[in-house]
A protein has these predicted regions:
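Bacterial N-terminal signal peptides that target proteins for export
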Residues: 1-12, 20
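Sec/Tat signal peptide C-region and signal peptidase I cleavage site
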Residues: 20-26
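Metallo-beta-lactamase
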Residues: 28, 32-34, 59-61, 67-69, 120-246, ...
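Conserved beta-strand hairpin/beta-sheet module of binuclear metal-dependent hydrolase folds
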Residues: 32-77, 178-192
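Divalent metal-coordination and catalytic microenvironments
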Residues: 37, 54, 64, 79, ...
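Extracytoplasmic/secreted envelope proteins and their assembly/folding machinery
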Residues: 51, 72-76, 100-103, 210-213, ...
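Active-site metal-binding motif and surrounding structural segment of the metallo-beta-lactamase
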Residues: 57-59, 69-114, 219-222
Length: 253
């Protein structure tokens, strides 16, 4: 839907405050404006990951739950410094700990945790395995219990009245990972699928990965900014071709 949602004076003032154009920072995490209501989270706890925040007229959507309830709490503090609107929902963009570890905190403040059915099912069956995998490489990572999403979509979905669109293009870094697109700002969030470096391929479908990226490119989304899920966050559309070249160079078993 084009244009901002019409709102009263009070809502407009809150919305204006949300888009003041700066950044806020805590010890290990920062929140920086990308374009309009779209912000990037740089989370430097454990292994650096980048998430997203959308400041809507009636509330906030977080894309990626961050690593743990503690990192989620730190992010929420930064969100409250930008806007007084409540966090409405948090998207688990895949079933791994960096995208779903903060679920317990977000639920505790009344936010809905949103995912595709594929992500929810993988989380239910494989959460103990992925926590153990995380703790093997990061012994300080907590032994987090499973906290499942409570809003589940069978396929692609939209939030914020179409201003945020989540879609699946195929298996890649994980079997279930989704992209999130902000059409008004022409910003694409690449999740763990897109990044500067090759990264962890322990759960990746290396054969299918390039095909997934080709399907993404075939959509011909207008992209001014592509946000990588790890490493440095802000790139142009060339990040897609860059990562496709990296993954194609990986020997296949």
């Amino acid at each position: 839907m084009k244009g901002w949602i019409k709102c009263g004076l009070a809502g407009a003032l809150v919305l204006m405050a949300s888009f003041w154009g700066g950044s806020v920072r805590a010890a290990g995490i920062s929140l920086k404006q990308v374009s309009g209501p779209v912000y990037v989270v740089e989370d430097n706890y454990y292994v650096k990951e980048n998430s997203m925040v959308y400041f809507g007229a009636k509330g906030v959507t977080v894309v990626g739950a961050t690593w743990t309830p503690d990192t989620a709490r730190e992010l929420h503090k930064l969100i409250k410094r930008v806007s007084r609107q409540p966090v409405l929902e948090v998207i688990n963009t895949n079933y791994h700990t960096d995208r779903a570890g903060g679920n317990a905190y977000w639920k505790s403040i009344g936010a809905k945790v949103v995912a595709t059915r594929q992500t929810r099912d993988l989380m239910k069956s494989d959460w103990a395995e992925i926590v153990a995998f995380t703790r093997k490489g990061l012994p300080e990572y907590p032994d987090l219990p499973l906290v499942l999403p409570n809003v589940v979509h069978d396929g692609d979905f939209m939030l914020q009245e179409g201003k945020l669109r989540a879609f699946y293009a195929g298996p890649a870094h994980t079997p279930d990972g989704i992209f999130v697109y902000f059409p008004d700002e022409q910003v694409l969030y690449g999740n763990c699928i897109l990044k500067e470096k090759l990264g962890n391929l322990s759960f990746a479908d290396v054969k299918a990965y390039p095909q997934t990226l080709e399907r993404l490119k075939a959509m011909k989304l207008p992209n001014k900014t592509v946000v990588g899920g790890h490493d440095s966050p802000l790139h142009g559309p060339e990040l897609i071709d860059h990562y496709e070249a990296l993954i194609k160079a990986v020997p296949q078993s």
